[in-house]
Amino acid sequence: MGEQPIFTTRAHVFQIDPNTKKNWMPASKQAVTVSYFYDVTRNSYRIISVDGAKVIINSTITPNMTFTKTSQKFGQWADSRANTVFGLGFSSEQQLTKFAEKFQEVKEAAKIAKDKTQEKIETSSNHSQESGRETPSSTQASSVNGTDDEKASHAGPANTHLKSENDKLKIALTQSAANVKKWEIELQTLRESNARLTTALQESAASVEQWKRQFSICRDENDRLRNKIDELEEQCSEINREKEKNTQLKRRIEELEAELREKETELKDLRKQSEIIPQLMSECEYVSEKLEAAERDNQNLEDKVRSLKTDIEESKYRQRHLKVELKSFLEVLDGKIDDLHDFRRGLSKLGTDN
């Protein structure tokens, strides 16, 4: 078309099955580009999608179209001119919401464009009718009010102007008649398409009711199966609990058997020990006698130690006494030595005097 897209997104394209009017048929193998365009030549808005070289959507938006969200990621609209229903599957709910909002905006713009076109057509039609009514009256007025001389002087230019106006009116009337015929055909096509779409919608409604009944049956069956699954899971839980109890009992039995084997081993050891008890008793008596003898020897040694301690104390006492006596003797000796020195000095002095 040579126009830039107003809005572009990507989606999986589907069309309703023309035979059953119930099932969706994929129009694209993968997500393709879906765009809104404004057709300047026809003053209309279109939704166009191309998969490679194949045009899979070329839908003209009209004010009576409605885009319906049927799930979180799927929406559809009916195209009466194409006699089909388009469906789009998006990768996210956000993309679906944006597409639906843009559809509403474009539908409002299409309504405004249609109203303007209708006003232009009505204005053109009214102008043609007024021109057709005014032409005879003006001719009549000129013939009544004018004189023979005036008729002669103005006949040439007036006829030329009237012919030109008549030619324009003929062309306008021809175009209007052609447009009216075209609109009648388009209106009849729209009525037939609306009738087919109404039938398809009624069949779809019946199919929806049937799907609802089937869904209700499936839901009841699903609930029954879920309850059965819950019962089986409960039974499995009980079986697992019993298995766990059995495992615990087996483990306890193994532990008790191990303890029993240990007790039997201890009993054997005790029996072996009981066989050597008499020998141990005799050895114990022998050791007791040795212990008593050692205790007696120890007692004797302790007595000797106490005696030696007494002797040591007495020896220390005598040493202290001897030290005192020795000290007194030394003091006396020192005094005697001092006296002897004094006596020598006296003798020396006497010898000197003689």
Swiss-Prot record:
GO terms for biological process: behavioral response to cocaine; calcium-mediated signaling; G protein-coupled glutamate receptor signaling pathway; negative regulation of calcineurin-NFAT signaling cascade; negative regulation of interleukin-2 production; regulation of G protein-coupled receptor signaling pathway; regulation of store-operated calcium entry; sensory perception of sound. It is found in: Cytoplasm; Cell membrane; Postsynaptic density; Synapse. CDD domains: EVH1_Homer_Vesl. GO terms for molecular function: actin binding; G protein-coupled glutamate receptor binding; synaptic receptor adaptor activity. Residues 1-110 form the WH1 domain. Residues 92-122, 160-329 form a coiled coil. It comes from the Eukaryota. Keywords: Cell membrane, Cell projection, Coiled coil, Cytoplasm, Deafness, Disease variant, Hearing, Membrane, Non-syndromic deafness, Synapse. Pfam families: WH1. One of its GO terms (cellular component) is dendrite. Its main location: cytoplasm. Residues 112-166 are annotated as: Disordered. Residues 112-122 have a biased composition (Basic and acidic residues). Gene3D superfamilies: 1.20.5.1700, Pleckstrin-homology domain (PH domain)/Phosphotyrosine-binding domain (PTB) (2.30.29.30). Belongs to the Homer family. Forms coiled-coil structures that mediate homo- and heteromultimerization. Interacts with NFATC2; interaction is reduced by AKT activation. Interacts with NFATC1 and NFATC4. Interacts with DAGLA (via PPXXF motif); this interaction is required for the cell membrane localization of DAGLA. The WH1 domain interacts with the PPXXF motif in GRM1, GRM5, RYR1, RYR2, ITPR1, SHANK 1 and SHANK3. It is linked to Deafness, autosomal dominant, 68: A form of non-syndromic sensorineural hearing loss with postlingual onset. Sensorineural deafness results from damage to the neural receptors of the inner ear, the nerve pathways to the brain, or the area of the brain that receives sound information. Postsynaptic density scaffolding protein. Binds and cross-links cytoplasmic regions of GRM1, GRM5, ITPR1, DNM3, RYR1, RYR2, SHANK1 and SHANK3. By physically linking GRM1 and GRM5 with ER-associated ITPR1 receptors, it aids the coupling of surface receptors to intracellular calcium release. May also couple GRM1 to PI3 kinase through its interaction with AGAP2. Isoforms can be differently regulated and may play an important role in maintaining the plasticity at glutamatergic synapses. Required for normal hearing. Negatively regulates T cell activation by inhibiting the calcineurin-NFAT pathway. This is Homer protein homolog 2.
